[in-house]
Amino acid sequence: MSKKVKKTRRGHGEGSITQRKDGRWQGSVLIGYDPETGRQKRKYFYGKTRKEVQDKLIKIIPKVQTGTYREPTKITVAEWFTTWLNVYMKPSLRPTTWESYRYQVEGHIIPALGHLRLAQLQTAHIQRLYNKKLKSGRLDGRKGGLSPRSIKYIHTVIHSALEQAKKEGMIIINPAEATKLPKQEQKEIKYLDAAEAAIFLATAKESKHFAAFFLALNTGIRRGELLGLRWQDIDFKACQLTVNQGLVRVTGKGLIFQEPKTKLSNRVINLAPAVLQVLKEHKAEQNEIRLLAGSAYNADLDLVFANELGEPICPRAFTRIFERVVKRAGLDVTFHGLRHTFATIALEQGVDVKTIQETLGHHSAAFTMDVYSSVTAKMKKEAADRVGNLLASLIE
């Protein structure tokens, strides 16, 4: 049975305030109209005193009048992030990027914040998540926390999802905006100098994957791009290769080929005569393997670097092969370090930064300069020393 209410005179700018039969006060304000029925939509407030209700109305009325009021959503963080991930992100992201986002959402974000209503999510909630993950946030069972870089990636996902919610009027401000991220220390880049590169190549020559290692060292090409390379991507007459796809592993799908992540990653790389010669020799050897395999060989994939049946080489398996070669050579470098080795040697040989940036597929020359700042600083010092020594010799 509904309770009767006692109407009182409406105060200036209060909206509507009434006193209930049980003694409590009730306030309401018109916030809009139902688009389907045309009926009024009102927001109700309750309090023990008239002033308590009046104060609540005073806060909301200006927002209603200026069109900035948003009715708090009842959707939870878990519900919204799941919707955002599958409805908004999946159609536009590369499979590997989407999989990475899903891992962050399901592994880190929902377990910590999923129970909260989206409208209740505050900066402090998100900041506590970052702080906790920094101390003990690993999901692989190992001790210790996540790196500042990993925290920044989680932040990117959270900020993006909340920004979409803000655009849709589900929240007024993005609470991730005011969080403070841990400082990222620039890691020292490990690469091979010219002498070490020579040792690596001498050792790698014993491997059947020598052509792949030689190409990587001469171009700075990424692992996935290397393993996704097709013969049709190599122009022996123009002495160039074109990066059109990469090989990646996606959970639930296995190994797949996908387009480069950016337009700049889809690039043309010039090849030196020595590289072309190694590739020609590799192709001749591959043709022999293909003849032995017969119809079992997957020639349709047209892969430059494939297994004995023409199928893709698993990126992780390829990395393990590389690591064994490095160990035999007595060196300490990752496969990605070959990319840094190429860039460093190119810089030291006087190749301009713009050319290196385009070859590596970096988004800007400034980024390339930032990544190799320690190398360029060393080069500048050496140049200054050479000029200084030359000028000093003139006054002796």
Where are these regions (language model features)?
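Catalytic-site neighborhood detector that most strongly recognizes the C-terminal catalytic loop/helix
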Residues: K48, K183-K187, Y191, G246-L247, ...
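Short, polar N-cap/turn motifs at the start of nucleic acid-interacting alpha helices
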Residues: D233-Q240, L331-D332, V351-S373
